[in-house]
Structure formats: structure tokens, C-alpha cells
UniProtKB/Swiss-Prot annotation:
Its EC number is 3.2.1.24. Its cofactor is Co(2+). The gene is Man2c1. Inhibited by 1,4-dideoxy-1,4-imino-d-mannitol (DIM) and EDTA. It holds the Pfam family Glyco_hydro38C2. It comes from Mus musculus. Keywords: Cobalt, Cytoplasm, Glycosidase, Hydrolase, Metal-binding. The lineage of its organism: Eukaryota, Metazoa, Chordata, Craniata, Vertebrata. This is Alpha-mannosidase 2C1.
Length: 1039
């Protein structure tokens, strides 16, 4: 090091170096001002369009002259620029860039292919035309730059998460050719890193002073106006970074990454272009840096690129073969980790892994979900069943209350399955390669001493962008520098292999990974939640009926292609910013259209399968009553009449089968169960009684009593009211659509605005009901019909709400005459317990939680279950069961939840445990109504059942055609243990089964899993909450 004296003033020395590299201060004489040399203008022309045109069509449009300073827009439009350039001959031998700065996101097209994204926000403002211009290179070129009128993070008006500004205009601020000085860039990287070391290690560190002294000497030596001084300065930096650390250094595995939300503050169609912008840039970086590895998730995005940018897709496949482009995740999209059903989660992997295998030759080894809002306790089992034992995320670093105690650990799921989990300790998936981030990765690591390896994801994310060459340059400098951890450009596989070597020292976390934030996403955009639940049910039913039709009809063609398309739409909507409701209005509208596509195409598939199912059966033309659930059901059903009206009938349908609809002459004159009695008292209250439960409603519609008749046990707390609607103020700290804060509970106000007296609806017999109106506020109202059917163990609340609020939260509460320290909540393929008290911060941080179809509060021998058909937010505090109904956030969608809503919830008191009482079956029944489908020909006059299960603890969840079997007449059955018990059971079938074998969730045959068929029965063994899948090869039916 040169021995130039300087005063011992740390701050002035530090800031001197800062100014020497500043892009703002003293650029007329500092090093940053020499990054670019000579420049020349380009010739511009443009055209503006509201459409997202393909390149071939765009370049055929009429372009008009344009210039720097031009404005274009508005939001979501696209401006195409034709850039005609001539490189000066005197630049031969130099590196030449197109310098481009504009608002919005840009994509450079060269020779008809996308070659690089350009965004100011993503620090990509130049495109390398030539790394070293040769005399033989063409100097006249025409490029096209496609500029999307939105930023990396959308176009929020005044705030990132505000609704988009539809009038926002965009401007081109720079377009020119310039000579790029790579040696200046290299020195700038060196000096920035030296400053980072000096600051990061602090004034107590010898190495910090060495870094600062080195940087200061470089400034002394380097004259920006004299490039011949650069090598001496560079030598000082090389000496510093070449001083290596010891063997105990922590190793950071740096992986290129570009998190692109499949939709969020921009619509789905813009995401397609974000992928092209980001991944074309990554391809260029992989070409220039053979040690650079880029991890990429989400099969849906790759499928979009394959369809719309086939040349780019081919390049990605090429780099995948080289090991530089690494598909990760294994799922169709990075889905929400809470709301999708267990079967939908399986399909995320089934569709994703099959796509990766088809397009890249292998399946993913790591589950990759860095940005979702919590992680179901069933994910470890689902992952393992899909060939994955490694999981990477970091979202729990966002916890608002408790700091999660691990960064590398084993996660044990509901059934006992274990996977290795890593949270990158830098608590980000968008690192930029700074010294500060590298140091935080070590100092913040909560598993120091247990493992000496950490992951480090670098690249701009959320809205795309990805890594830059500068990030790579920084990380390469830090590969092995004394005082810092060792940094190696690595892959997810290399990281987890290193972690597995240290796995004997790791701790285990059991149960769900609950994010203590974003609890509002269980409720926001209720219509999206309803669409999700309904479409999961539709696809389930279509698959069941189509499978049965395949088994019974030689002519029936299973609609595999149509079902794959509909499933992929549903899986797309389960992206973690869509089904959660944390998206802009454009996205919500697209998602609702996708749900409508599933309904409109799914219902005809149901009818076609039903027609094929009963083809050739004797009997009169009429209706077929179909049960798609694996237990016998006796229920009241509204059957259509020829005149268009409906009549009620009590029908019994066997497990996964059908029964003929009763004709008017066949209706029983006497009911096998006690009929429903309805009585209105003089005080206006109404009592409904079916001999199983007795319901009493006060004149406002509140529940004053709910009695289990056989025992006389009252379920409603003494002096309290059930079915009490309550309104809360709902103003979070920032994340409007995402968060409901703990303090909202302090603002509870019962809804007391009665709009009409309680009236009797249906007067009894097969069904009794009462209805009422409620004025929630001057702008919002509610109507509800309370329904009790003969033989039904629960009372239903059919609810319609006209909701026009701002930052309010509507819930319904049921105070129970029950005491228990924990409540039970249904999750995917099972259930779990959460506390009803606030003993610890981990307990009270769960003030708002999620569940699927039911929650239950039980004490010894008695309990109360709250069922629903489309809600997810819930809580049980003390003895009060609460269901979250509607929110009213204003960002990023100002219209979220406004308008009309319909939903149903139900209340079921029960003797004994919820398992013994059949709560799980009841919740399924509420969500999967019996189907009354017209038989186009003669309807069968006898009942028929395809499958049944001997144990009520085992649920036959799915019946579908196998995806990849060579024999098309192969079915997949998926069953799970629902009670939390070890069970041996028999699966009965009437189908012509030729062979039965166990398989994994990806439908790959278990070589040791052959099952013997005995009298049309298969014996199966389950451990608690275990999910098992079978392949059934069918015999061909007679023609």
C-alpha cells in the first residue's frame, strides 16, 4: 500500500470515498462521471397502442418520429420505439452501449428476439451492443424497444400499494449510444465494496480500517481524467480482496433469483412480458458468466414464455442442460400456503412437476415458496409425496410479534413427515450483493454453530428485474476475503447438500408455520374465496363422475385435456396474491372470469358424465340424484318441477353413487324421522325443532338457545346471544388488503340495526325456516334465512349481504357454553388445534387465523362446530366462536368486497368428540350438495354405489383418471385419515378392478405397493392424517 499520510478522521475519509463514486455529487470530476465516454444520438420513431402486441405485429405498425423528452401513456398502454443507430467508426475496439432511460418497463428486441429488459428501478439502463467493437462488425442497426406503461411494481397512485393511476403518463428521458469504460466500472465496484467493508465491520475492526485506508489510497492514486492511473488503483483493491480468510469462514451460497408475482399490482398478461424482460436479461448474464446459476420457479410462467417467446424458452432449456438455469419449486405457481385445499396443493405439484419433467428433463428437488402468507402443517407430507424433501422460504421474517427461532431446521408436518427447511438469514429474496447483506446473512443466522452454510438470493424481485452484472461482480470479489464470509456462486442443490451434511445438529419445528401478519388475506375479496371453494368442488365432482363413466361405458372419453385446462385456471388463481385478495381490481376481474370459465365448462362436463354413467340402464326418463362423497346420505333436496318451480323431497343416495329421483307418487306419506316443527311466539321469537336439535331465535334473528334434544344440553352460553353480527374498525398500519391488526378487536360493535321483524319462511315438515333483515349501517344491509331440515344435525344460515363500507370488518359470533383451552380447525387433509387463550405472545399473535370448512370447540362429551361453505378467516377466543365474513380495504383495489354477497354457515352442537359426532362428514355435505342431473335417456330405477369405505375416519377425497399411465383405463384414488388415529379399513368397490397398486402423489407406482383384491375389497392401513394414493387398473366394460 502506498505510504501517503492522512489524518485519523474516519468520517471525512469515508465520505471522501463516497463522493468519489457518487452518481449525484461532483460527477464532473469524480470517477462515476467517467463511466461513459463519447456518445452519439440515435434516430427514434414510435407508435402507441392499448394492446400488448406480439413483435411480429408491432413492427408492422405505422411509426411516427419521436425524440427524447416525449411523453406517452396512459397506464397499461404500450409504446413501441424503433431505434435506428449508426456506431461511429472511431469506436472500434471499445465497448458500446445503448443507453436508455424511460419510465415504465422496457424490452429490447434485436433480430426478432427479446434480448434484455431495461428498467431504471431495476438498475438496467443500458444494453451492451458490443463488448469490443470490431472493424468487421455491422455499425448500422435497427432495434425495437417495447415500453410497458407500468413500473416494476405497477402504477399505484401516490403509494406502491394504492390502486393504479389510470391517467399516469410516462416519459423517455435518455436514448443514445455511448462508449462504456469497463475499467471504471470495475474500480467503482471495488470502492463500493471497500466502503461496505469499512462500514459493516465497524471502527472496532482492524480489517475495517484496512478497507478504508485501501479505498483512500485508491482515490489518491486514481485520477479520473487519466486512465493510465487506473491499473495502480486496481492493484490495491486486488491485494485487499485477495487476502483470504481462514477455514472456519461461513459459506454463503449466492443464487441468482427473480421473484415475479404471477399477478399482483399488474394483470396476468403483464406478467408474461415481465418474464420475457427478466429472463432474457438472465440469459445474457449466463452467457457472460459461466459460473452464474439462476433459480427459477413457477411452471405457469415458463409455459407462458414457451407459448409467446419460443426462442427465449429454447435458450432457457439450453442453459438448463448446462446446469446454469435451475427450475425450482415444483408447483404450477407459487400458491398461497393456507387457503387451497389439500387436493389443490397436490395438483400444484402434479401439474408443475410434470411440466418441468417434460420441458427440462427432470423434476424439481426443492419446494420454493419465498413470499406466501403462512404454510400449512400438511405441506411436508404433500412435498414428500411429490418427491421433494427440501424447502426454501423467508416470509416468516415478516412476523410482527415473535421472531422465528430458526433459519435452518427440520419441519415436521401433521402426519410426522419431515423436510429440511432453509430461510436465507438475510431475510430477503431480493439481495443485491452488498457487504451489508453478506454480513447480515451471518450475524442474523439463528443456527450459527449448527451449520456453516447459508443461502443468498440476489436479484430484483416481486415485479421482476432479476440479477445484474454489477451484483455478480460484487459477489465474485467477495469469494474469499479476510474478515467476511466466503461467497460462492451456487445452486439450490449445492446449498441443501451442504446443509444436509450438518443436519445432525439441527432443531425440529412441529406443526404449521404461521405468519404473524397478513391475517386479513383469509377474508379480503370474499368473492375470490367463494369462487375458489366452488371451483374446487366442481372439479372434484366432474372428476368423480367422469371416472365412474369411464369405468362403466366403453364409449365414454374421459375429458383429460379439458380438466387439465380448468385445473390450471384454478391453480393460477391460487397464486398467493390472487386468492388472498391482495391484488388490483384488474387481477380480481380476471380471476372472477377464470372462475366463471371453470363453472361454464365444468357443468356441461358433469352432465355429459352423468349421461354416460346411466346409459343403457332401464327406467323412466327423469332425474338422477348423485352423491360424490364416500358415505351414504339422506337429505332434503329441492327437485325441479316441469313448471319451473321446485318441490322438496327426502332422498337417500349411496356412497359415491346415484339413486333415481323420487316421483310425486313415490313420496313417503310418513317421514322416517321426526318432521321439523316451526313455532312463532307472541314475542316474535321463532323455534325450529327437528328432534335432533332445537333452535330458538329472538325477534332480531339472534340465537338465544341451541339445544341438543337427546341430552337436553344447551350450546349457547347463558345470557349470551349467538348469530350475533359484529362490526369492527379495520385500519391497518400499511398493508391494507393484507392486514387486520390486533387492535381491531378493541373496536367491537354489535350490529343492532333491525330492518324488519323475524318471520317464518318454510313452515315445517321436511324443512322449517325463519328469515329476517338487518341494517348493518346506512349503506349496508343483510338478509338471512335460518333453515333446519328433517334429520339434519346442524342449522344453516343462508345469508345475503349488500356491503358498501370503508375499512370495516364484519364477523358473526357464537358464545358457547363450553370451556376448553384449545379449539380445532380444519386444514388440508386434516385438522389442528390452536389455543383459545392469550398466555404467551405466540398465543395472542393468533388473534385471527384460518380454517377450511369447519372449526370446533369441545369439552368432554360435548362440543359445538361452526361450518361454512366459502369462508376461511376465523377465531375462537375464550368460549366465543367467530367467523370472519367481509372486509372493506381500499388498497390495492378500492372496490374490494363492495357489492352483493351470498354465503352459508351452519352450527352443529354434538355429543362426544367432533370425530364421533360426524362433524367432518357434515362439513363435507354442506360443501358438496347432492346433484340432481337430468338423465337424457331412461334414468336407472335402482341405486348404485361405486365405492365405500368401512371407517368413518378415512375420507376418499379424489377419484380421477391417472395422468401418465399408458393404460387410459387407470384411475387414481386419494384417501386420507381425518380423525387423527391409526386405522385399518376396507375400501369396497363395484367397479371392474383388474389391478390395484399404491402410488405417490405424482401417480408414480410404488414397486412394493401391490394390493390384493378380496371380494371387491382392498385393505388399507393409515396412520394419523396420512394421505394415501392408489392406482386402479380397470377391466374394459362390455360394449
Amino acid at each position: 500500500m502506498a505510504a501517503a499520510p492522512f489524518l485519523k478522521h474516519w468520517r471525512t475519509t469515508f465520505e471522501r470515498v463516497e463522493k468519489f463514486v457518487s452518481p449525484i455529487y461532483f460527477t464532473d470530476c469524480n470517477l462515476r462521471g467517467r463511466l461513459f465516454g463519447d456518445s452519439c444520438s440515435v434516430t427514434l420513431s414510435s407508435f402507441l397502442t392499448p394492446e400488448r402486441l406480439p413483435y411480429e405485429k408491432a413492427v408492422q405498425q405505422n411509426f411516427s418520429p419521436a425524440q427524447v423528452g416525449d411523453s406517452f401513456g396512459p397506464t397499461w398502454w404500450t409504446c413501441w420505439f424503433r431505434v435506428e443507430l449508426v456506431i461511429p467508426e472511431v469506436w472500434v475496439g471499445q465497448e458500446v452501449h445503448l443507453c436508455w432511460e424511460s419510465d415504465g418497463e422496457s424490452l429490447v428486441w434485436r433480430d426478432g428476439e427479446p434480448v434484455q429488459g431495461l428498467t431504471k428501478e431495476g438498475e438496467k439502463t443500458s444494453y451492451v451492443l458490443s463488448e469490443r467493437l470490431r472493424a468487421s462488425d455491422p455499425r448500422s442497426l435497427t432495434l425495437y424497444v417495447e415500453v410497458a406503461c407500468n413500473g416494476l411494481l405497477g402504477a399505484g397512485k401516490g403509494s406502491m400499494i394504492a390502486a393504479p393511476d389510470p391517467e399516469k403518463m410516462f416519459q423517455l428521458s435518455q436514448a443514445k449510444l455511448a462508449v462504456f469504460h469497463r475499467d471504471v466500472h470495475s474500480l467503482l465496484v471495488d470502492l463500493e465494496l471497500l466502503l461496505g467493508v469499512a462500514k459493516g465491520l465497524g471502527e472496532d475492526s482492524q480489517r475495517s480500517f484496512q478497507a478504508l485506508h485501501t479505498a483512500n489510497q485508491m482515490v489518491n492514486i486514481c485520477d479520473p481524467a487519466q486512465p493510465e492511473t487506473y491499473p495502480a488503483a486496481k492493484a490495491l483493491a486486488s491485494k485487499f480482496f485477495g487476502q483470504h480468510g481462514g477455514e472456519s469462514q461461513h459459506t454463503i451460497h449466492a443464487m441468482g433469483h427473480c421473484h415475479i408475482d404471477t399477478a399482483w399490482l399488474w394483470p396476468f398478461k403483464e406478467t408474461v412480458r415481465k418474464c420475457a424482460r427478466s429472463w432474457s436479461t438472465a440469459v445474457t448474464l449466463m452467457e457472460q458468466n459461466t459460473d452464474f446459476i439462476f433459480a427459477c420457479s413457477q411452471a405457469q410462467q415458463l409455459e407462458w414464455v414457451k407459448s409467446q417467446y419460443p426462442g427465449l424458452h429454447a435458450r432457457l432449456q439450453e442453459f438448463a442442460c448446462r446446469g446454469q438455469f435451475v427450475p425450482v419449486g415444483g408447483t404450477w405457481v407459487e400458491m398461497d400456503g393456507n387457503l387451497p385445499s389439500g387436493e389443490a396443493m397436490v395438483r400444484q405439484f402434479l401439474q408443475g412437476q410434470n411440466f418441468f419433467l417434460q420441458e427440462f428433463g427432470k423434476m424439481c428437488s426443492e419446494f420454493w415458496l419465498p413470499d406466501t402468507f403462512g404454510y400449512s402443517a400438511q405441506l411436508p407430507q404433500i412435498m414428500q409425496g411429490c418427491g421433494i424433501k427440501r424447502f426454501l422460504t423467508q416470509k416468516l421474517s415478516w412476523n410482527l410479534v415473535n421472531s422465528f427461532p430458526h433459519h435452518t431446521f427440520f419441519w415436521e408436518g401433521l402426519d410426522g413427515s419431515r423436510v429440511l427447511v432453509h430461510f436465507p438469514p438475510g431475510d430477503s429474496y431480493g439481495m443485491q450483493g452488498s457487504v451489508e447483506e453478506v454480513l447480515k446473512t451471518v450475524t442474523n443466522n439463528r443456527d450459527k454453530g449448527r451449520t456453516n452454510h447459508s443461502g443468498f438470493l440476489f436479484g430484483f424481485g416481486d415485479g421482476g428485474g432479476g440479477p445484474t452484472q454489477t451484483m455478480l461482480d460484487r459477489l465474485k470479489r467477495l469469494s474469499n476475503t479476510d474478515g467476511l464470509p466466503r461467497v460462492q456462486l451456487s445452486s439450490p442443490g449445492q446449498l441443501f447438500t451442504a446443509l444436509e451434511r450438518d443436519s445432525g445438529q439441527l432443531c425440529t419445528w412441529v406443526g404449521e408455520l404461521f405468519l404473524e401478519l397478513h391475517n386479513g388475506t383469509y377474508t379480503t375479496h370474499a368473492q375470490l374465496k367463494k369462487g375458489n371453494r366452488e371451483c374446487e368442488q366442481i372439479l372434484h365432482d366432474v372428476e368423480v363422475l367422469s371416472s365412474l363413466a369411464l369405468a362403466r361405458s366403453a364409449q365414454f372419453l374421459y375429458p383429460a385435456a379439458q380438466l387439465q385446462h380448468l385445473w390450471r385456471l384454478l391453480l393460477l388463481n391460487q397464486f398467493h396474491d390472487v386468492v388472498t385478495g391482495s391484488c388490483i381490481q384488474l387481477v380480481a376481474e380476471d380471476a372472477m372470469n377464470y372462475y366463471e370459465d371453470i363453472r361454464s365448462h365444468g357443468n356441461p362436463l358433469l352432465s355429459a358424465a352423468a349421461a354416460a354413467l346411466c346409459a343403457g340402464e332401464p327406467g323412466p326418463k327423469g332425474l338422477l340424484i348423485i352423491n360424490t362423497l364416500p358415505w351414504k346420505r339422506t337429505e332434503v333436496l329441492a327437485l325441479p318441477k316441469p313448471c319451473g318451480a321446485h318441490s322438496l323431497a327426502l332422498v337417500t343416495v349411496p356412497s359415491i353413487g346415484y339413486a333415481p329421483a323420487p316421483t310425486p307418487t313415490s313420496l313417503q306419506p310418513l317421514l322416517p324421522q321426526q318432521p321439523v316443527f316451526v313455532m312463532q311466539e307472541t314475542d316474535g321469537s321463532v323455534t325450529l325443532d327437528n328432534g335432533i336439535i332445537r333452535v330458538r331465535l329472538d325477534p332480531t334473528g339472534c340465537l338465544t338457545s341451541l339445544v341438543l334434544v337427546a341430552s337436553g344440553r344447551e350450546a349457547i352460553a347463558e345470557g349470551a346471544l349467538g348469530n350475533q353480527f359484529v362490526l369492527f374498525d379495520d385500519v391497518p398500519l400499511y398493508w391494507d388488503a393484507w392486514d387486520v391488526m390486533d387492535y381491531h378487536l378493541e373496536t367491537r360493535k354489535p350490529v343492532l340495526g333491525q330492518a324488519g321483524t323475524l318471520a317464518v319462511g318454510t313452515e315445517g315438515g321436511l324443512r322449517g325456516s325463519a328469515w329476517f333483515l338487518l341494517q348493518i349501517s346506512p349503506n349496508s344491509r343483510l338478509s338471512q334465512e335460518v333453515v333446519l331440515d328433517v334429520g339434519c344435525p346442524y342449522v344453516r344460515f343462508h345469508t345475503e349481504v349488500h356491503w358498501h363500507e370503508a375499512h370495516k370488518f364484519l364477523k358473526v359470533e357464537f358464545p358457547a357454553r363450553i370451556r376448553s383451552p384449545q379449539a380445532t380447525y380444519e386444514i388440508q387433509f386434516g385438522h389442528l388445534q390452536r389455543p383459545t387463550h392469550n398466555n404467551t405472545s405466540w398465543d395472542w399473535a393468533r388473534y385471527e387465523v384460518w380454517a377450511h370448512r369447519w372449526i370446533d370447540l369441545s369439552e368432554c362429551d360435548f362440543g359445538l362446530a361452526l361450518l361454512n361453505n366459502c369462508k376461511y378467516g376465523a377465531s375462537v377466543r375464550g368460549n366465543v366462536l367467530s367467523l370472519s365474513l367481509l372486509r372493506a380495504p381500499k388498497a390495492p383495489d378500492a372496490t374490494a368486497d363492495m357489492g352483493r354477497h351470498e354465503f352459508t354457515y351452519a352450527l352443529m352442537p354434538h355429543k362426544g368428540s367432533f370425530q364421533e359426532a360426524g362433524v367432518i362428514h357434515a362439513a363435507y355435505n354442506l360443501n358438496f350438495p347432492l346433484l340432481a342431473l337430468p338423465a337424457p335417456g331412461p334414468a336407472p330405477d335402482t341405486t348404485w354405489s361405486a365405492f365405500s369405505v368401512s371407517s368413518p375416519a378415512v375420507v376418499l377425497e379424489t377419484i380421477k383418471q391417472a395422468e401418465r399411465c399408458h393404460q387410459h383405463r387407470t384411475l387414481v384414488l386419494r384417501l386420507y385419515e381425518a380423525h387423527g388415529s391409526h386405522v385399518d379399513c376396507w375400501l369396497h368397490t363395484s367397479l371392474p378392478v383388474q389391478e390395484a397398486t399404491l402410488c405417490d402423489l405424482l401417480e408414480q407406482r410404488d414397486p412394493t405397493g401391490h394390493l390384493s383384491l378380496q371380494d371387491n375389497r382392498l385393505k388399507l392401513t393409515f396412520s394419523p392424517f396420512q394421505v394415501r394414493s392408489l392406482l386402479l387398473v380397470l377391466q374394459s366394460p362390455p360394449n
